[in-house]
């Protein structure tokens, strides 16, 4: 495998499938199956999951909520997703721990870096919930932060599209997909694949990012193996 320790970023929207809201059990089962295959090959895997399928802080803020309050509600949504994903993984035979940046000891461990790394070394998947515990930071930034903290070799951003495009491929059929970008390309052109804070964190810590389509069968395994898939973002051109 190309990467020994991986941080997988899953959007909350990915978990809802075509439902428009909530969690699609079939999607959770499919993700669990792919993750089980990766872990069985010896890869150490941590996951950061978003909460946009349940609540998105920015939308709440736009609707009149105080931004910090809306972000905290969004963090709680990520914990709901994390626990659901943990259940799916354990039904697939993958030992899993959820660590929350907001204390809720009845359902999750507190986030402790050394403990998370020990879980990974023992072959357990660690799911990080509640973002980084602070408002005004996205779960993409959390993914970059946790990747740096656990010494991950790559951030795999699993999305609904098969990479980064020069414009929205849903709206523009002539959109062109990039196979490779530098961090500076993403920042300078405001490509929007991740927020600038997340990109800067990965850039500063020399952690490559691979953006790929979550829904292609076996794509998580392919991304972990370093196969050419989606768009790769690195320091060098």
From Swiss-Prot:
Pathway noted in the entry: Pyrimidine metabolism; CTP biosynthesis via de novo pathway; UDP from UMP (UMPK route): step 1/1
Q: Name one GO molecular function term.
A: ATP binding
Where mainly located? cytoplasm
Q: What subcellular locations does the record give?
A: Cytoplasm
UniProt catalytic activity: UMP + ATP = UDP + ADP
Task: Detail which positions bind UMP.
Answer: 51, 71, 132-139
A GO cellular component annotation here is:
cytoplasm
Region annotation (Involved in allosteric activation by GTP) ranges: 17-22
Q: What is its EC number?
A: 2.7.4.22
Binding positions for ATP? Answer: 9-12, 52, 56, 159, 165, 168
- The transmembrane residues are none
Keywords on this record? Allosteric enzyme, ATP-binding, Cytoplasm, Kinase, Nucleotide-binding, Pyrimidine biosynthesis, Transferase
Q: Which SUPFAM superfamilies match?
A: Carbamate kinase-like
Q: How is its activity regulated?
A: Allosterically activated by GTP. Inhibited by UTP.
One GO term of the biological process aspect: 'de novo' CTP biosynthetic process
Q: Which Gene3D superfamilies match?
A: Acetylglutamate kinase-like
Q: What family does the entry list?
A: Belongs to the UMP kinase family.
Task: State how it assembles.
Answer: Homohexamer.
Q: What does this protein do?
A: Catalyzes the reversible phosphorylation of UMP to UDP.
Q: What is this protein called?
A: Uridylate kinase
Lineage runs: Bacteria, Bacillati, Cyanobacteriota, Cyanophyceae, Synechococcales
Q: What gene is it encoded by?
A: pyrH
